[in-house]
Amino acid sequence: MTHPSTVRRPIQVEHVAIEATKSFEAVKAALEALVPPLDPAISEALRRGDIVRANEALYRGPELAIFSARDHGGLLRTAGLVRKTVQYEIGNPLTATEMTRHQLPTALYAPLRVLLYENEAGRAVFEYDRPSSLFGQFGDERVTAVGRELDAKLESVLVKAAG
């Protein structure tokens, strides 16, 4: 009888924190103004199998979109804590396919997770893992190059929202 095999290997990830000069509410509003939600027409077209319409929506979309936003602060309230924090999934479906066409496991990290929270000093902070360090683990320069492009795009929009 055969058994499933498991492979484990350590990876090194570069973690980034950006402390804002504005309040949590102002930074959240700025981010959501700069990065729109993912166009629901994309998912709807894919669900219907309408690849032409999905591609039209994808190609007219923004460089980055918010796939989801989770109010982690709401969850913390169940533990009796009051914290302002939102976890975002941010990315671009076309960018994701540039990587997954070469290395399907990159889908583990696309879209990217970004955490926005208010720290103890009352300042808003973004934290995320640098895309090129996540995607670099796959050892495919085509994927790592896309990760480096994402490094610049993500940092640029977060710094703009934070400032």
Where are these regions (language model features)?
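Helix-adjacent hinge/juxtasegments
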Residues: 58-91
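Short, internal acidic amphipathic alpha-helical interface segments
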Residues: 83-120
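Conserved NAD+-utilizing ADP-ribose enzyme module
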Residues: 63-64, 134, 141
